[in-house]
Swiss-Prot record:
Keywords per UniProt: Carbohydrate metabolism, Chitin degradation, Chitin-binding, Disulfide bond, Glycoprotein, Glycosidase, Hydrolase, Plant defense, Polysaccharide degradation, Signal
Protein name as annotated: Endochitinase At2g43590
UniProt KW Signal keyword: yes
Entry annotation: catalytic residues: 128 (proton donor)
Signal peptide: 1-24
Lineage, broadest ranks: Eukaryota, Viridiplantae, Streptophyta, Embryophyta, Tracheophyta
Disulfide bridge partners, by residue number: 27-35, 29-41, 34-48, 52-57
Region annotated Catalytic, chain positions: 66-264
Glycosylation sites: 261
Record organism: Arabidopsis thaliana
Length: 264
């Protein structure tokens, strides 16, 4: 009988220990351990890879931090746009709410975005728009972005397909494909991108999901190549370094490691 009581006490102690262990795993990991998407601590790809919540995450596996709106706070957004001059048209155009509203129309993005991805995205937004100063490409209207050989998305007479929005959407084939995806006639009305902030952010997100997100796991440098490959391999080292600088800054603000392969 005494043996049975002792065994029972030991069993209860063990259960208590494992209960506390599980609590710590969901997710109070030591600083050198990753918290996996399922709430457990470890160091290999199962913990530090896709879905990683905290710790030294790798690739796209960075802390989610919750919804898009909880990551892109008003303070985070203001820290960027407040660096634009008072005379900037974009300062009266781009808003944090228009970004969040646009992001929520892309559930695959909104439901899986990570802090590192937000840092990546806003580093490029910052570079492309001058801290959200510019809505349209400087002198863009004087440039020809019509690829006449593209018969799937033919250019409309008198319309310009120069860079607009946070990712500076350019060329008729991008306006056409993007508009088709979003249910908008951007071939005939490309100016919508420069007149409606939610549409502007939606075009940026469309380009992101199709051309940038697929290479996120390769590091920040691969995203530079996806957006403007002409800057890579010494094409424009100043621009590359500027993008990396913004990225490092935003990773710091959001509390995530920038990861490897930052340059291109």
């Amino acid at each position: 009988m005494a043996f049975t009581k002792i065994s029972l006490v030991l069993l209860l102690c063990l259960l208590g220990f494992f209960s506390e262990t599980v609590k710590s795993q969901n997710c109070g990991c030591a600083p050198n351990l990753c918290c996996s998407q399922f709430g457990y601590c470890g160091t290999d790809d199962a913990y530090c890879g896709v879905g990683c919540r905290s710790g030294p995450c790798r690739g796209s596996g960075t802390p989610t931090g919750g919804s898009v709106g909880s990551i892109v706070t008003q303070g985070f957004f203001n820290n960027i746009i407040n660096q634009a001059g008072n005379g900037c048209a974009g300062k009266r155009f781009y808003t944090r709410d228009s970004f969040v509203n646009a992001a929520n129309t892309f559930p695959n993005f909104a439901n899986s975005v990570t802090r590192r991805e937000i840092a990546t995205m806003f580093a490029h937004f910052t570079h492309e728009t001058g801290h959200f100063c510019y809505i349209e490409e400087i002198n863009g209207a004087t440039r020809n972005y019509c690829q006449s050989s593209n018969t799937q998305y033919p250019c409309a007479p008198g319309k310009g397909y120069f860079g607009r929005g946070p990712i500076q959407l350019s060329w008729n084939y991008n306006y056409g494909a993007c508009g088709q995806s979003l249910g908008l006639d951007l071939l005939r009305q490309p100016e919508l991108v420069g007149s409606n902030p939610t549409v502007a952010f939606r075009t940026g997100l469309w380009f992101w999901m199709n051309s940038v997100r697929p290479v996120l796991n390769q590091g920040f440098g691969a995203t530079i190549r996806a957006i403007n490959g002409m800057e890579c391999n010494g094409g424009n080292s100043g621009a590359v370094n500027a993008r990396i600088g913004y990225y490092r800054d935003y990773c710091g603000q959001l509390g995530v490691d920038p990861g490897p392969n930052l340059s291109c």
